[in-house]
Amino acid sequence: MTRRIRSIVACAAAVMTLAQPISARQAFDPARGRSGLIAPATQVMVLGVSHLDNAPKAFDPAWLEPVMCRLRTYAPDVILTEAMSGEQLAGIDAYKAVRGDAGKWAGPTLAIAGDAQAALGITGPDAMAQANALMTGSTPTAADRRRLAALFLAAGEPFSAATQWLQLDPAERLARDGITETMKTKVERFGIGRGEIVSMAVALAVRLGLPRVYGAGDHLSDVVLPDNAAFGAAVRASPEIIAQLDKATPSLLFFGSKALALDAPDRVMPVFRTLNSPAFGKADAQAQWLSLQQSPKLGALGRQRVAAWEAQNLRMATVVREVTAPIPSGKALLIVGAAHKAFIEAYLRMMTDITIVSVPAMLDSRPTGC
């Protein structure tokens, strides 16, 4: 009888252990793997920005120099942006019956990719494969850079094409080695603009002599977005949600668009400090996203919208992890809309070989020449 009682007690103890919260049983945490690394963890800096295409008309990309100088000092080995990769664009385009029209996100990219593929007589994947092979060689010649620009255009990677093109001497920016006159015009357009992809990512890659920039943006997750009409109606019926989305509540006014407008050179550093502060990350996540899934009026629609947002950010974090795989202990920089920053950093912190570099510390640093 005593043995039977002991057996029952042991079984009950096992059941109680299984019933405990996962945290109480010390669930596997990938981030703990960093403690056993044989070398320093790979560094990732996630720089949050307000999309510069939407900046006030007075904004001049030259105002960004204090930030750019510090980024040059950080000297990333790879640079990623919120642009979609050519591979994802092609996939969405192929599955447009399911995924929708990729052209609404990157119509010019798809158009020039089609033209370049026709001119070169290759497919997008073949163009990317050839570009990868050419980048593994010795220091590229002018002819190599022109060829790479053509291949990147065909692969749906116009910002990488611009990165190669702008590393050519102006006299070498010629329509040859696969570049047609039309392609020359288009690649030059992709290298001009005040949006952060061009004015920050491409400009920095050119200055550092990097071969390309990587698109980490995602719209595969759009397929799980809630019905737009129903979601819009639910939001319009929720003034408290609108106030948070517009950052019109007293606690959010400091983070509103007017407070963060880049309307003068001396506003750049304060705005970047705010957008990359933990306080902004928490407040913005609550206002834009968590509030949606906490609203009884939005119900399942709000939760579905947040699910799509999380899926989008998880995919972006995945791209960062893939791109950093070949550079263990190296440095990566992701330039992205500030709303993404807190989520992507949280997901990257779960990785076994990633450490997040502090943007506030970078902005507060005073490197020589900055």
Model-derived segments and their meaning:
Residues 25-45:
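N- or domain-start disorder-to-order transition segments that initiate the globular core
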Residues 102-168, 246-290:
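Low-complexity, serine/threonine/proline-enriched polar segments
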Residues 256-370:
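A cross-kingdom marker for long, charged
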Residues 165-167, 172-297:
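Extended, H/D-rich, highly charged conserved domains that either
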Residues 10-19:
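Bacterial N-terminal signal peptides
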Residues 48-61:
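Acidic/histidine-rich helix-loop elements
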Residues 75-81:
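Proline-aspartate-enriched helix->loop->beta-strand connector
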Residues 1-9:
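Bacterial N-terminal signal peptides that target proteins for export
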